[in-house]
Amino acid sequence: MPSCLDSWAVLAWLDGEEPAAAQVESVIGGERPLMSWVNLVEVHYRVARDHGAAEADRVLAELRRAVAEQLPGVAAMREVATIKAEHPIALADCFAVATASAGMATLLTGDPEIVERAGELPCEVSDLRPRR
C-alpha cells in the first residue's frame, strides 16, 4: 500500500524525532509518498518561522523531489469538507486524510487529532509516535 505524509511526519523527520524520523526516511528512500500541497505549505511556513525563508525554500525543494505532490481538485475539496464536517480536526489535517484516502494510501502521522480518530477516518493511519 502506498504511503502519504502529513506535516507532523515531515516536521518530525526534519527534527530527527524518533521513531518517526527513521520511518519517514525509510518511506522516502523506497517510494515517493503522497503529500498534499496544503501540507507542504504548512511545513514551509513552520520551517520559515523557526529557521528563516531560505531554509524553508531549501526544505520545500528537497520535499518536492522526494514526494508525489497532490494539488487538491474539486473532488478532493468535497472530501475535505466532508471530513471537516464530521470530525473535529484541523483543516490541513483533513487535506492529509483526503489525500491518503484518494490515493488508497496509509497516512503516516503522529498528530493526536488524527491518530485518536483513526478508526473513524476514510484511510488507514500509521502512528509514528514513540510506543509507551
Segments (PLM) and residue ranges:
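Phosphate- and divalent-cation-binding pockets in alpha/beta enzyme and binding domains
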Residues: 42, 79, 116-117
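Active-site-proximal, substrate-binding regions of enzyme catalytic domains
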Residues: 40-68
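Acidic catalytic patch
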Residues: 64-86
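Alpha-helix capping/helix-boundary segments
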Residues: 9-10, 39, 76, 96, ...
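Conserved SAM-binding loop
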Residues: 13, 69, 107
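Acidic, PIN/NYN-like endoribonuclease modules and their adjacent C-terminal/linker elements
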Residues: 66, 97-132
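Short, well-structured N-terminal submotif of metal-dependent ribonuclease cores
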Residues: 1-35, 48-58, 132
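Short beta-strand scaffold positions
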Residues: 5, 35, 71, 91-94, ...
